[in-house]
Amino acid sequence: EIRRVVLEDIGSPNRLAADPTPLYFEDYAADFKIAGGAYHVTEALVLEFGRRFDPQPFHTDPVAAAKSRFGGLIAPGCLTFSIRQALYNQLPCRPVLVAGLGLESLDLATPVRPGDVLSLKVEVEDSRRSKSRPDTGIVTTRQRVENQNGEPVLTMLAKMIVQARDAG
């Protein structure tokens, strides 16, 4: 049962967008922004993901969650991050990625609840050509997942190495 819920609720929307436009280092100008997605968070997904990966009562037990400081079920942070990746994969363009370098920050600002509809906004925070590998650039993006009310539920800075069109 867990496998079915996780695959249906996370796996299906996690497919890559059809024929995404490749983004090279030069495409990541300071004003680059993109947004998209509509991910519907279900109670079944929160419960099953919580039971499998983060078995806290406010993720796994509606009665206990109602009595918690959250006043109801909330999604595990690792589920919110996974949904962010599913939304990212659905964007109509994708970096020509050499490697991910990591996250500089990750904040979970507002709890995600069953019934929420999440969307993603991505903008360039910084980009510079690599000194050691001038055929690539280092791009830092600010990513923000919002609920249907426009409230941030996850914000992060992600750094990656992206292929350049030319050698500099």
Task: Give residue spans per PLM region.
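Hot-dog-fold acyl-thioester-processing enzymes
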Residues: 2-102, 165-168
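HotDog/MaoC-like acyl-thioester-processing domains
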Residues: 1-29, 108, 112-117, 121-168
